[in-house]
Amino acid sequence: MMPEHTMTPSLPGSLPGSAASTAQTPPTDFLDYWKLDCREVRTFRGHSHGIWTVAFSPDGLTLASGGAERLVRMWDIETGRLLRSLRGHTNDVRAVVFTPDGQTLATGSEDRTIRLWNGKTGEPTKILFTRYDHNVCSLSLSPDGLMLARGSHNKDIKIWEVTTGTELMTLLGKDEYDHHWSVCVAFSPDGIHLAHGTDIGKIKIWEVLPSGEEKVLHDGHWRRGVEDSTETRGYYIEDDGGFQKPMDYWIGAMTFTPDAKILITGSRDRTIKLFDMPHLIEKKSLTGHTGWIRSLAVSPDGKVLVSASDDQTIKFWDLATGRNFRTLKDHTGAVRCITFSPDGKRLASASWDRTIKLWEGGAKAEE
């Protein structure tokens, strides 16, 4: 899952640059905001098959989505109108992400390609072939929007330069267990680290240096000499040699808090884990979902975590306490993706029920 980019919202009825819109307003406490209320604002319909992924444009005015019908769709947030459908992928579209300037939309597919589009017009600009790779299943942009990393059904991670489409580097572990899929990737908001998770619950943190070199800071893997079973799958922290509690099967979602101090992972074992960075010391394990956790998002102030699951629910968590304070059950299929709007006041959810739902919190505006 990708880091959120914050923006200052205009006051209702004000124009950008006006005195009202530039006046100092107190920052939103998103824990209070999402505790007060959460209401469905709009449902976007038009996908003919299940939806894997959804993303807000940086200006908060457009949604991009992709799914099993092989199309990328772009929507007007305020009206729910379908703006355009982008054609080119030949298999499920698993990931969509806008660059911070909104000029480029990157999409990844099970057809083994990453496509770059004009973020405003939807015109295709580049195709990044993944050669001998398998399905592309996650994408992450560096905070400056210059580097794009992909996770796939392959054991390595590739990073491209967005502006040129040039492949910059391939990250590949050096231990005997590095033959499993690197399915999930996430750049930290400070741009220092790249995290990735595998289909067996391994967690790896990379430091991508300006020279283009990579340094493995922590390398999780199976405990050596232990039989391969779901009871022994987990991660291993090399600093102290301690084998932690198992995280069965693959990691379905990864994200960071905005200050880059905590890495959050969600897994097929139905748990969410919080780790202190950069040493991957487990802080909390959150339970409550009854299905595979597919997506995670953190509010701009780092106080609220939202999770989406195959159990058809969306859960809101107080990150400080680990308490689940709200559960949404409005989708009728697995919820595959959730994402906050740039200002943190809206949430979009994409589901296998072929709909995208838009949610708002806080006090309801007067009619």
Language-model features: where?
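WD40-repeat beta-propeller superdomains and closely related acidic/aromatic-rich repeat-like regions
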Residues: 2-367
